[in-house]
Amino acid sequence: MLSTMSPRLSLLLLWLLLLINAAHPVGALPRLCDVRRVLLEERAECLRELSEEKKALGPKTASGCERFWDNMSCWPSSALAQTVEVPCPKFLRMFSGRNGSLFRNCTKDGWSETFPRPDLACGVNMNGSFNERRHAYLLKLKVMYTVGYSSSLAMLLVALSILCSFRRLHCTRNYIHMHLFVSFILRALSNFIKDAVLFPADDVTYCDAHRAGCKLVMIFFQYCIMANYAWLLVEGLYLHTLLAISFFSERKCLQAFVLFGWGSPAIFVALWAVTRHFLEDFGCWDINSNASIWWVIRGPVILSIVINFIFFINILRILMRKLRTQETRGNETHHYKRLAKSTLLLIPLFGIHYIVFAFSPEGAMEVQLFFELALGSFQGLVVAVLYCFLNGELEVQKKWRQWHLQEFPLRPVALSNSFSNATNGPTHSTKAGTSEQSRSIPGANVI
């Protein structure tokens, strides 16, 4: 007896899952057209195999249960009194990312009902109240990261313009900062472009007219994300090198850093795109149901986070040792305050907060989304403020220009080294020239 529950259940699952999908901000759930296409492809493949089996049998009648399509899965032919196992339907794995199995018995009356229930076996939540709460949560999250990326984008553009405009600020350290700013800008822009492509008003546009363009957008998005992590790692590597190595060529290192920061992400993203094309080519490539393929990108990102965290710990150890040699015993409170300030300055520059959820379980996904999207979207804003707008030398330059224009409106503005040397802002001095060889570090003025 064929199951009469399967078609209704499949439609119910689709309806409930698509309610969640309508508000998902990061493109982790498929569109209805993607699900429909997967179902049609699997149905066509199942019917083709059934036709070939019938041709092979000829006029003979097969005993047992023949292959059939139940609107969710393709069940292979089976002998009587056998239990057949098939994996969870592909469209359910697209939503849940969970691998499971469904079973049917071949009886003298035909196929039995499916067991266990597909929603339970395949990890699909059928709780309507939970879905509504998640829907509202994801909407709020989307608003938060849109505000975060917008504010970060505006501040980063201004900060980048400032660093590019002042020739006195052109040094290896600030060149690295500028590349980091550009990576944050690209990350924000790629998020806006991705949302515009993945969530248009018309599903047909998404599914048919711009399928190739949509995949290119996702390739660009993944590249921008990886490039941002790469430049966070470059910041950590550069500062660690300043403290750990006495002499090295900063100019040659800058060339290597640029090649690594922009080149290494391209290699991994290209490998991911080729793998997706041949092994998981459905939808807009915004769904990562195959964990093995996703690790082509996730693996290097987690590795960069771990390496940067190791740099962070070692840098703090070196700073603590240096401070202990400089401080007197009676000034322990001041010593710890300066170390705390240095630590807080390094956290956004290195992206240390990412280590919290680098190895998070699936159950912590919503909390991880909050930290990485809602709070992480403001990281560019924080970095721009700390390493540009609160920069000590920039503060003096602005005040000096204002005073000079008021007192001598017809004379050109010239900044002497005495003003630069007198700076004592909340972050490190960014003066170029011989000061680079002094191995000053971010936050040196507050240590």
From Swiss-Prot:
Residues 29-140, 195-215, 276-290, 356-366 are extracellular. One of its GO terms (cellular component) is basolateral plasma membrane. One of its GO terms (molecular function) is secretin receptor activity. It comes from the Eukaryota. In brain, expressed in the hippocampal CA1 region, the lower layer of cerebral cortex, the anterior olfactory nuclei, the anterior ventrolateral thalamus, the lateral region of hypothalamus, substantia nigra, tegmental area and central nucleus of the inferior colliculus, the ventral supramamillary nucleus and the cerebellum. Expressed in brown adipocytes: expression predominates in mature brown adipocytes (at protein level). GO terms for biological process: adenylate cyclase-activating G protein-coupled receptor signaling pathway; cell surface receptor signaling pathway; diet induced thermogenesis; intracellular water homeostasis; positive regulation of lipid catabolic process; regulation of appetite; regulation of synaptic plasticity; renal water absorption. Belongs to the G-protein coupled receptor 2 family. This is Secretin receptor. It comes from Mus musculus (Mouse).
